[in-house]
Amino acid sequence: MRRFFGTDGIRGLTNKVPMTAEVAMRVGMAAGAHFLRGDHKHRVVIGKDTRLSGYMLENALVAGFTSVGMDVVQVGPMPTPAIAMLTRSMRADLGVMISASHNPYQDNGIKLFGPDGYKLSDADEAAIERLLVEEPRLADATHIGRAKRIDDARGRYIHAVKQSLPQMVRLDGLRIVLDCANGAAYNSAPTVFWELGADVVAIGVEPNGTNINDKCGSTAPALLQETVVASGADIGIALDGDADRLIVVDEKGSIIDGDQIMGLIGASWARQGRLKGGGVVATVMSNLGLERFLEGQGLRLERTKVGDRHVLERMKEGGFNVGGEQSGHMILSDHATTGDGTLAALQLLAELVAAERPASELLHQFDPVPQLLKNVRFAGGKPLEDKQVLAAIAEGEAALNGRGRLVIRPSGTEPLIRVMAEGDDAGEVERVVDMICDAVRAAV
């Protein structure tokens, strides 16, 4: 069983194992040793979001990587997809992003990317886990790595993201409210939209180390909704702490989630002959309404386990180029190797410009069926193996059979059991979710 790696790298509470300086240094040693392949000069790119603990973890990782003979390029606060892009662009052996995504500042995490810009495979993560508990293979004094900061990384990323749009597409005349969650994109995303001609109202762009995702960003869109309406904006865009996801708000203040965005881009790209794979890849959490909408367009919805890495794996296997999650992760593999909120927003805005219709008309592609998600916290044990819980799940599945879906799973990042049900009958959906949640609480 893995001790450190979860569904999205290594994550935890700062200064508690595994998110300590000591563990971070050993991660640098282990990952560095694993990727010391060939006789070229080895290099790792390290970026971070704006959490206070990022400084501590960055220095620990630098010490670990250089101690085994790897050079380090430090790029400072940058979106997660920027690290993936820079890793490929700089021909680095490895990329590291220090972030806990949408979590509060007390948490932090370490995400690793291979030289191809994709998140590491299960096999690579397992190999690094093994090396973490072994005696590190340190370089001799003449082969210790060097660390260097570069100042133009932000400009490289901004240029690459803008290149995803055709040269003739401009955002002139659009007023956009952009919420950067006081996170990694605070100094890149506003520039992207401004350089393309938009009138940008930026919020969440004053990070202080402890205000990342604090009442702002994609998981707390109330401020964005209020600002869009108050400023008379055409659209609002909220990124999360590491800018790999987005949530959109139309000019009336209504929220558009990842399902609606996937539906719009998938259907539009299909009409343009740009869609690959004959459909869209999403997770088991995406709304049944999206599936029905795509079927009506002659497209299919491929479902995976929760997590953008599972979405990307299926996209690569099936030759798809559009995938994502209801939470706002958008993977557009013609342009990026991982989810990129800024890039996805540009593709969405290109559709808005071309349609010449209000966001409230264009972005509501379908009516979602009633869906309810509740979380039950547990301290330990295996509540999903409890007989009463299993009986409640079976009863819920029988009740929704043919009229909805039921998904019960443990969170990959927190001690939670997530219970989701959806169907045409909102009352029945709520009854099923509450019944299963009660059974889980009784079991723990």
From Swiss-Prot:
Active site location: S101 (phosphoserine intermediate)
Matches recorded under SUPFAM superfamilies: Phosphoglucomutase, C-terminal domain, Phosphoglucomutase, first 3 domains
Function: Catalyzes the conversion of glucosamine-6-phosphate to glucosamine-1-phosphate.
Gene: glmM
Keywords of this entry: Isomerase, Magnesium, Metal-binding, Phosphoprotein
UniProt cross-references to InterPro entries, sorted A to Z: A-D-PHexomutase_a/b/a-I (IPR005844), A-D-PHexomutase_a/b/a-I/II/III (IPR016055), A-D-PHexomutase_a/b/a-II (IPR005845), A-D-PHexomutase_a/b/a-III (IPR005846), A-D-PHexomutase_C (IPR005843), A-D-PHexomutase_C_sf (IPR036900), A-D-PHexomutase_CS (IPR016066), Alpha-D-phosphohexomutase_SF (IPR005841)
Originating organism: Sphingopyxis alaskensis (strain DSM 13593 / LMG 18877 / RB2256)
Gene3D superfamilies: Alpha-D-Glucose-1,6-Bisphosphate, subunit A, domain 3, Alpha-D-phosphohexomutase, C-terminal domain
Residues the entry annotates as binding Mg(2+): S101, D240, D242, D244
Cofactor, free-text remark: Binds 1 Mg(2+) ion per subunit.
Statement: the UniProt record of this protein carries the keyword Phosphoprotein: yes
Sites of Phosphoserine modification: S101
Enzyme class, broadest EC rank: isomerase
Protein name: Phosphoglucosamine mutase
